[in-house]
Regions:
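Thiamine diphosphate
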Residues: 1-149, 199, 282-338
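Glycine-rich ThDP/TPP pyrophosphate-binding loop and its adjacent helix/strand module
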Residues: 56-62, 66-68, 105-280
Length: 339
């Protein structure tokens, strides 16, 4: 693999954003399906995150110190796979010939068949609740200082599960959870409920106990400041970055236009888009990696727990025995997960 850029300034991050847009267009047009415009709106956000803030060892996805990146807007998979190309874990050939093909690991919505994907997403409103679970595990079970970054779409902000997740994140003081909301104003059926009304989103986030940061989602300097502030693990609140963006940003024929959700650009149109975006690029980047942390804590310690005992022949309802055991094990807070 060629030597990647590792000391990435904002100018290079902006170039990376353009590359992610170009590759989102190329891959979806090649596949004949996909969501390029939804990917283009969030490209700058992800370019700055991956190149300057996400602490991740791409060669060791099982490193317990790695940050976690969850695409709650899983339909923006062209963007995620373009990121994987940019960090060198998949090739341009795989991106162009594998995306959305039968039998390929580059599925229409990301799944853990890829070692860098924690959870399968695509059902809107699912990714942030997943992120809360991962953040809980990091803070209370493993006690490892990773951050959980969740990319959300503005359409899914109408889902109740998003707000339930934020409520629980604030209750459990998950400062290690950062949601990035791509407010591009347009959903599958037209304008979203609140459009670009970031003040309404801000009031709702704060009402549920979160810290809101409102930015221009195409200003790489503003993005960089917001990510640095959110990722500092200061305070006790989850952070929600509310980024105003343009769907299809960078290509004038589709930018902020309705009826382009979930539609690949026709071949000739895609060529014009690539030209307007400055042509193909093949930047290779690597951002920060996690520092050497203490091994994560094993949540066992059963010797400290006095389990219920019953006399031979004593009749005990299974649900009561199960409940008694859970109550005893639960005396050690957040040390037990059961289904």
């Amino acid at each position: 693999m060629p030597t990647p850029h590792t000391d990435i300034d904002l100018a290079l991050a902006a170039e990376l954003g353009q590359q992610l847009r170009v590759d989102s267009v190329r891959s979806s047009t090649s596949a004949g399906s996909g969501h390029p415009t939804s990917s283009m709106s969030a490209a700058d956000l992800m370019a700055v995150l991956v190149s300057r803030h996400l602490r991740y060892d791409w060669d060791a996805p099982d490193n317990p110190g790695n940050d976690h990146l969850i695409f709650s807007k899983g339909h923006a998979s062209p963007l995620l796979y373009a990121i994987y190309k940019a960090v060198g874990v998949i090739s341009d050939e795989e991106l162009m010939t594998g995306y959305r093909r039968f039998g390929s690991r580059l599925e229409g919505h990301p799944t853990p068949v890829l070692p860098w994907v924690d959870v399968a997403t695509g059902s809107l409103g699912q990714g942030l609740p997943d992120g809360v679970g991962v953040a809980l595990a990091g803070k209370y079970l493993d006690e490892v200082p990773f951050r959980v970054w969740v990319l959300c779409g503005d359409s899914e902000m109408a889902e109740g599960s998003i707000w339930e997740a934020l409520d629980k994140a604030s209750y459990y003081k998950l400062a290690n959870l950062i949601a990035i909301v791509d407010i591009n104003r347009l959903g599958q059926r037209g304008p979203t409920e609140h459009g670009w009304d970031t003040e309404t989103y801000r009031h709702r986030v704060t009402a549920f106990g979160g810290r809101a940061i409102v930015i221009d989602g195409h200003d790489v300097a503003a993005i960089d400041r917001a990510l640095a502030q959110a990722g500092g693990l200061t305070g006790e609140q989850p952070t929600v970055i509310l980024a105003r963006t343009l769907k299809g940003h960078g290509f004038s024929e589709v930018e902020d236009r309705e009826n382009w959700h979930g539609k690949p650009l026709p071949a000739e149109m895609a060529e014009r888009a690539v030209t307007e975006l400055g042509g193909e690029r093949h930047l290779l980047v690597r951002g920060p990696v996690p520092g050497e942390a203490a091994p994560h804590r094993a949540a066992n310690g059963l010797a400290e727990v006095k389990l219920p005992a019953y006399d031979r022949g004593q009749k005990v309802a299974t649900r009561k025995a199960y409940g008694d055991a859970l109550a005893a094990l639960g005396a050690r807070p957040l040390s037990l997960i059961h289904i």
